From Swiss-Prot:
Organism (species): Prochlorococcus marinus (strain NATL2A)
Taxon lineage: Bacteria, Bacillati, Cyanobacteriota, Cyanophyceae, Synechococcales
GO molecular function: mRNA binding; rRNA binding; structural constituent of ribosome
Basic and acidic residues composition-biased segments: 234-244
GO BP annotations, alphabetical order: translation
UniProt xrefs under InterPro entries: KH_dom (IPR004087), KH_dom-like_a/b (IPR015946), KH_dom_type_2 (IPR004044), KH_sf_prok-type (IPR009019), Ribosomal_S3_C_sf (IPR036419), Ribosomal_uS3_bac-typ (IPR005704), Ribosomal_uS3_C (IPR001351), Ribosomal_uS3_CS (IPR018280)
HAMAP family attached to this UniProt entry: Ribosomal_uS3_B
Claim: Ribosomal protein is one of the keywords in the record: yes
General function of this protein: Binds the lower part of the 30S subunit head. Binds mRNA in the 70S ribosome, positioning it for translation.
Cellular component annotations (GO), alphabetically ordered: cytosolic small ribosomal subunit
Protein name as catalogued: Small ribosomal subunit protein uS3
Domain of life: Bacteria
């Protein structure tokens, strides 16, 4: 069953959290759900070069909180935070409410090569440049292994290398326990547009197991203490709306 169901959906409330956190009555629920989709689509299209891994949305009364997980936060923040104001006005225009309070937090992805979506995006970019798919997969696996992931599975499907008949090929390195609910599986999909058609990309990344009474997974053999040599991931929190 673990191979049939969506890896994220089956782990909601165990190791995964919802990407949208808010409550609404049945009449306004569809409108807010479409609003979240428009916001994510707008951000992904506007910041293609920022390496955005995920967009989390939360609502509190009339305030909208948007958290961006990105590999290059400087592209979004800009000089002296000018990019934040531009992004806020763009979100307000997208949802059609200029008076809505929008709070934006930009969080840097600590390990880019251990993120499933960023790995899938890297594979898609290489395939669109006509790089051989086996070479691309091998390079992605090497990058993930250097990042310290415990397991990785990559699947690519379509007209591989321009073949007449579409097929799917996959590779796996390490452990990817899809049946274990306490396993933190980072899953992402991406579509690569090539001259021969579109290729579907799926990436599973196993980062560790969440044991009872633990909030974050600890990889095998690692220590919970952070070494002094490791750099803290950058986080930019928007406080411009406070006090209004």
């Amino acid at each position: 069953m673990g191979h049939k169901i969506h890896p994220t959906g089956i782990r909601l409330g165990i190791t995964q959290e919802h990407r949208s956190k808010w409550y609404a009555p049945s009449k306004t629920y569809p409108l807010l759900l479409q609003e979240d989709d428009r916001i994510r689509t707008f951000i992904k299209k506007k910041y293609l070069a920022a390496g955005i891994s995920d967009v989390l949305i939360a609502r509190k009364a009339d305030q909208l909180e948007v958290e961006l997980k990105t590999a290059r936060p400087g592209v979004i923040v800009g000089r002296q935070g000018s990019g934040i104001e531009e992004l806020r006005s763009g979100i307000q225009k997208t949802i059609g409410d200029r008076n809505r309070q929008v709070r934006i937090n930009v969080v840097e992805v600590e390990k880019v090569d251990a993120d499933a979506y960023l790995l899938a995006e890297y594979i898609a970019q290489q395939l669109e440049k006509r790089v051989a798919f086996r070479r691309t997969i091998r390079m992605a696996v090497q990058r993930a292994q250097r990042a310290g992931v415990l397991g990785l599975k990559i699947q690519v499907g379509g007209r591989l290398n321009g073949a007449e008949i579409a097929r799917s090929e996959w590779t796996r390195e390490g452990r990817v326990p899809l049946h274990t609910l306490r396993a933190e599986i980072d899953y992402a999909t991406k579509v690569a547009s090539t001259t021969y058609g579109v290729l579907g990309i799926k990436v599973w990344v196993f980062k560790g197991e969440v044991l009872p009474k633990e909030e974050q997974p600890l990889p095998v053999g690692s220590s919970p203490r952070r070494s002094r040599g490791n750099r803290r991931p950058q986080q930019f929190e928007d406080r411009s709306n406070e006090g209004k």
